[in-house]
A protein has these predicted regions:
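NAD(P)H-binding glycine-rich loop region in Rossmannoid oxidoreductase-like domains
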Residues: 1-27, 31-34
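SDR active-site strand-loop-helix element
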Residues: 4-5, 42-48, 82-84
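Alpha-helix N-cap/loop-to-helix boundary motif
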Residues: 13-24, 51-63
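Internal, well-ordered alpha-helical scaffold/interface segments
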Residues: 26-30, 40-43, 65, 69
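Residue-level signal for alpha-helix termini/capping positions
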Residues: 33-37, 133
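A short helix->loop->beta-strand "cap" motif at the edges of active sites that frequently abuts
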Residues: 36-40, 76
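Oxidoreductase cofactor-interface core, primarily capturing Rossmann-like NAD(P)-dependent enzymes
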Residues: 52-159
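C-terminal accessory extensions appended to soluble enzyme cores
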Residues: 160-164
Length: 164
């Protein structure tokens, strides 16, 4: 199972951010665990800076970390935690705030200068699907930081007709 649900920090209240980041994730995992094979895997879109210790002052990091910790304790045979940094949207969209508009504008330079701090949305999706399909024999939890996600993508054959 691949689970990707979240909200922009600042777009919702702190309580809503926790509900979306933790409560929905945990409830979905609980239902999935009860109704799926004992060998089921759970791939979770977390985020750069997620803090499973709960000590972060940043709500996003604290909540994603809490969800990660709960998933690792939920009894799945395999849990894959993906922690991308800035996710570059490959489709046009209305950016939610100035910082997202700025990142979109400087992405080409940022990608060259700090490649381990950015990932294209389609590359992230490819990596998550690849891990979910191919990592069937491994047990336990595994964290994929942004550089690990990029390495997974670079190990795959290139996609055709792709911009940026």
């Amino acid at each position: 199972m691949i689970f990707c649900l979240g909200a922009y920090t600042g777009a919702v209240s702190d309580a809503e951010l926790r509900t979306i980041s933790v409560d929905y994730t945990v409830e979905f995992a609980r239902v999935l665990r009860l109704s799926s094979s004992p060998d089921a895997a759970f791939s979770f879109l977390s985020g750069n800076g997620a803090d499973p210790t709960g000590r972060s002052r940043i709500p996003f990091a604290r909540y994603k970390g809490e969800a990660e910790k709960t998933l690792l304790e939920a009894g799945f045979s395999r849990v894959y935690l993906f922690r991308p940094a800035y996710i570059y949207p490959v489709e046009s969209r209305k950016e939610p705030n100035f910082s997202y508009r700025l990142m979109r504008a400087i992405y080409p330079a940022f990608r060259l200068l700090f490649p381990n701090q950015v990932i294209r949305a389609d590359d992230l999706a490819r990596a998550m699907v690849d891990v979910a399909i191919r990592r069937t024999g491994e047990r336990g939890g595994q964290v994929f930081e942004n550089r690990d996600i990029r390495a997974l993508v670079e190990a795959q054959p290139p996609l055709r007709d792709r911009a940026a």
